[in-house]
A protein has these predicted regions:
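Short, small/polar residue-rich loop motifs at catalytic or cofactor-binding pockets
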Residues: 1-2, 224
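C-terminal cap/substrate-recognition subdomain and adjoining C-terminal extension
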Residues: 84-88, 95, 105-303
Length: 303
């Protein structure tokens, strides 16, 4: 059976959170990123139409302020590890099927990783990010950065609401126009791919791991496709049909190619854990949390 395999990037393919690593080029940037990520989580919980993962747009003022450019993104991306077994998985699946990446990642990072594992640009759906076009803006955020470092959790929402409301109107427009490919936009990408391939959603295998993937996983599962969570968190696992926790992606290629998924799970005795996500979800979450921490460390805590 011909399948359209759609993988998230950060987590399943590479453990690096590229935006987090990029912010670490800025003094105290990792801490600032973590505060903004918490703000993003708050908005995702409180705002009905808000899409989680918007952190990638919200950090823009800080990247612009410190003149971070496309070469910086590429340089950070070059240091990103590729998860064990990914190249073999892509090679195996591309022999009979179509392989796509759907990622919140900035395009510079997504294309760099794609090149390293044999996925061309045209098969990657990601966040367009022409940051060099914004480097002529001069904004001083030193005082704001000091305040952010001292923020208590209960003050995060109020501070950032005011910060983004009062920010320079041109910068605000850039933030608003940055379309981060997470949430519903990942689902949109699935349908664009189906139109391009002239296939229906039952041919889709979607693989994700976090809050930005759950809508894609849910849509594919409900429409008869195959949805898989890899080293996922509590936001993604309940919406997938199957789950795999491990340190090597190669078994996932064999699972995807298997004709009887439930039988494969019963017989599996290799490294890692396969589950059919229909019961014991809390147990599955604990197993995945362990492997997520092994594989992603700090990045795995960021939504």
């Amino acid at each position: 059976m011909y399948m359209i395999v759609c993988f998230d990037l950060e987590g399943p393919i590479s453990p690096q959170d590229n935006a987090y690593e990029l912010m670490k080029l800025i003094p105290n940037g990792g801490e600032i990123f973590s505060k903004i990520s918490k703000y993003d989580d708050i908005l995702a919980l409180k705002k009905k139409d808000y899409e989680a993962g918007y952190t990638l747009a919200l950090i823009l003022p800080f990247l612009i302020s410190h003149k971070i450019n496309e070469d910086d993104i590429k340089r950070v991306s070059e240091k990103a590890k590729i998860n064990e077994g990914v190249k073999e998985l892509v090679s195996i699946l591309k022999k009979k099927h179509k392989f796509y990446i759907i990622s919140t990642s900035y395009e510079q990072h997504a294309y760099s990783i794609g090149k390293r594992i044999g996925v061309p640009k045209e098969d990657i759906y990601c966040t367009k990010f022409p940051i060099n076009d914004y480097l002529h803006y001069d904004i001083d955020l030193q005082e704001a950065e000091k305040e952010i470092l001292n923020l208590k959790d209960h003050n995060i929402e109020e501070f950032f609401n005011n910060f983004y409301e009062k920010i320079d109107k041109d910068i605000k427009k850039i933030i608003e126009n940055t379309k981060v490919i997470g949430g519903k936009y990942k689902t949109e990408a699935i349908y664009k791919i189906l139109e391009r391939e002239n296939e229906n959603i039952k041919s889709v295998v979607a693989v994700g791991d976090s809050i930005t993937d759950f809508k894609m996983l849910k849509a594919v599962k409900e429409k008869g496709g195959i949805s898989i969570v890899f080293n996922g968190n509590e936001y993604a696992i309940p919406y997938a049909e199957f789950a795999f926790a491990g340190t090597n992606l190669l078994p996932l290629a064999y699972f995807i190619e298997s004709k009887n998924k439930k039988e494969f799970i019963k017989k599996w005795n290799g490294e890692g854990y396969f589950h059919h996500v229909n019961k014991d979800i809390e147990k599955i979450i604990l197993i995945h949390k362990k492997y997520r921490n092994i594989m992603r460390g700090k990045a795995g805590e960021l939504g």
